[in-house]
Amino acid sequence: MMMIAQTRSFGAAVALAAGMSLASISSVTPAQAQSTSEAQAAASLSVVMEFLSNTGPDKVEAAAERLVAPDATYVSLNFDNPELKKILPWTGTNKGPKAYSSVFMQVGSYWKIEDFTITDKIAAGEDVAIFGKFTYRSVAVGDVFTSPFAILAKVRDGKMTYFQFMEDTYASSSSFRQSGSWTVKTTKAKPSFSVGVE
């Protein structure tokens, strides 16, 4: 009983703070709430898709300024990996519209983009997930690789506030390899073996 009273009081406080009556909050039907949620999801997806459609070097800076919040976070490939950052300098966590545009501008100088295909799009409220695959050719070495990718984005008030891009970084880093190999031991039961041997 006490929980119900507290919940009603909290609901009344929220309603008053928003300038709404408790009756108007309780009059929202599940269908109306779903419709609002679906509209928000569609709007969030639209922002992310518009950004992805404008990632060419001549468009990405304007797209980032238009579609990215000033304090937005971009997580590229890993939260923080100094060794990977030596190979892929955009690796890590950065802030602001320039973080978004600089990633795509650098990618364009490292690889020729041969294919970028979105296979699935999911949106719920302000959250958006995009999945697909891409094929890139390294500019310096000429090696080609194909990788799956996954994007998690958050959109608030028509601007992205968070963007996380994941790919097969073993494949992307290997596209620059000129020589060398690793000796790897994955479990105690298995013997060591070499990878990257030509």
Question: For the regions a protein language model found, what residue spans apply to each?
Answer:
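Bacterial N-terminal signal peptides that target proteins for export
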Residues: 2-15
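C-terminal segment of classical bacterial N-terminal signal peptides
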Residues: 19-30
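Residue-level detector of intrinsically disordered terminal segments
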Residues: 1-3, 19, 159
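Short, low-complexity N-terminal intrinsically disordered segments enriched in polar/charged residues
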Residues: 28-70, 183-198
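Hydrophobic pocket/interface hotspot
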Residues: 48, 63-64, 72, 96, ...
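A solvent-exposed, acidic/Ser-Thr-rich amphipathic alpha-helical stretch
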Residues: 66, 70-125
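A beta-strand edge to alpha-helix "cap/lid" segment located at domain peripheries
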Residues: 32-40, 108-198
